[in-house]
């Protein structure tokens, strides 16, 4: 254990044999009904890792049936003490911690994550999320209500039922934990569809679900494509809720499918173009580093990236200079290699999309300060890229890039920057850097975002809720608010012969 409290960093595993490539339904491994599989690739080498069974509508039907049976009244899961539910989630967290090295290595190979980041940050957060949720299992309580008349009234917080959970490829282990943790602690059953690009860690966790002792059907994991498996979950008449993290475009489709089927509950965490505002009175060293990490962590592949950076004009030139110096310090290469701190984008499609947006910045008149092109002859690498002299009407200032591209814009006044920061369809997170407390409170109140970080960035935690305003989605994940997204409140009122205070 290091002096910071983080575990020491071991070497990644070598010559890993992929053990789990089938669908996990009812605590058993299944081939797909269609017999189809799909390839999974290493984005750093472009080499195929393995083939994984491809879930389709028929496989989703099997998973939903298993989840529904596990949720029936009188089932082992429904009759289990809440404290025992919590113990199962604690056990799952312990098993993930035991297999931390394997999971971090898989995350690095399959998702292109820097190994140190996967091991020290992603897996650490995943374990903390599950333990936080485990602690909530026997603390979800209703209320007694002093209603008028000769009645006794109380509320129950009941599990919603069968929950579909769909998430993308940029943080597979974190997203898996943030989905299943709250759902399971409330007593729901789940059908998980990980991204087709990155199913391997979720499938290993499936084996740990069974080892931990969860009853059959409580957790089902069905890798597949969005238009088939994802659509089947969203439109299924026997799924009670769907939680989705991904693009706004797909989020709209999921909400529409939910409405047109059985009006299932929906939680959405969608696209973003997050403003980060640096005032002249900020600690410049700290602001440069936080803003840098905010956009370049995980090669910019983050819905909470600081992708719309506003810097007050009196410090603008120095801020740009320091940011460029920082961005030039990266070491590219295989994410498993010690010392490498900049990995690949997830696939060719994302690589091409990011490069197209970089080219648009050049054409529309932004000043390219560094980067601006691909790196290497193999793998989907893009150089950390910084643009200055960016204006609000440029595509790079308006569209979610999801890559290692920092746009630095200039502002003059507080009122101006608030208006410009809010001039977007999105509202997921924001950052504010200032030593002025009044300014910090004023701006954080005015920004239309579900999370505002002051003098920090990427400071997410299991205890704090996260979610979006506007087209960045609705509902919350994590914290007490996120737990209650997985319950229905039932009111029970009884006639009594006499009521006393």
From Swiss-Prot:
Catalytic reaction annotation: an aldehyde + NAD(+) + H2O = a carboxylate + NADH + 2 H(+)
Main subcellular location of this protein, as a coarse class: cytoplasm
EC number: 1.2.1.3
Keywords: Cytoplasm, NAD, Oxidoreductase
Entry's Gene Ontology cellular component terms: cytoplasm
A Pfam family matched in the record: Aldedh
InterPro entries cross-referenced by the UniProt entry: Ald_DH/histidinol_DH (IPR016161), Ald_DH_C (IPR016163), Ald_DH_CS_CYS (IPR016160), Ald_DH_N (IPR016162), Aldehyde_DH_dom (IPR015590)
Pathway: Alcohol metabolism; ethanol degradation; acetate from ethanol: step 2/2
Active site annotation, chain numbering: 269 (proton acceptor), 303 (nucleophile)
Quaternary state and interactors: Homotetramer.
Family from the record: Belongs to the aldehyde dehydrogenase family.
Name assigned to this protein: Aldehyde dehydrogenase, cytosolic 1
